Swiss-Prot record:
Top enzyme class: hydrolase
Entry keywords, A to Z: Cytokinin biosynthesis, Glycosidase, Hydrolase
Protein name: Cytokinin-beta-glucosidase
Pfam families the record matches: RolB_RolC (PF02027)
Gene expressing this chain: TROLC
Top-level taxon: Eukaryota
Function summary: Hydrolyzes cytokinin glucosides thus liberating free cytokinins.
EC number: 3.2.1.-
Species in which this protein is naturally found: Nicotiana tabacum
Amino acid sequence: MAEDNLCALFFKLTVQGVTCSDGLKKHMENAEDELKPLLEHGPQGESMDIDEEEVSGAKRLLYLYVDCPTMMRCFFGRSMPYNCRGGTLLTDLPPYHADASPHEVSRGLGKATDFFSYEDAIRSAYFAAFSFSGPVRKLDQQLELTSTRGEPLTFSLYARSPGRLEPGELVRHGECKFAG
């Protein structure tokens, strides 16, 4: 019975029917608006604990880029994947950024992690958006990309220590809609 509930929750949180970056952006903005109380106070009513002065004002969603089978195993196993030496590498790069190509995102993530292979763009073709109740550490290193127009793009990187993934921490998941 609990497995059926997890399957239903995983399906409910899947972003479906979105075919372009603008559609995914609108969907994620709506999800963020619906979840403002969670983003401000965490899934269990606690503040999202990000180890820094502040994350550019308000708390927000953080994204993990992995392939779909890896995310499913993590969700059903209730644990975060190890994709960097510090545990789980997260970023504020939204999965609908219209000026970032899938290959450039893979290149940037591969450069940022010293542990997980992002050589194949399929590794970053799928996203999971999170709001954590536990600690998340902002890294000194940044995700540096080159836009489709040749301009630099910079995003923050975060690490979450290995630990249990609570179902309420996963906000949405689905296919990325980067340029391309």
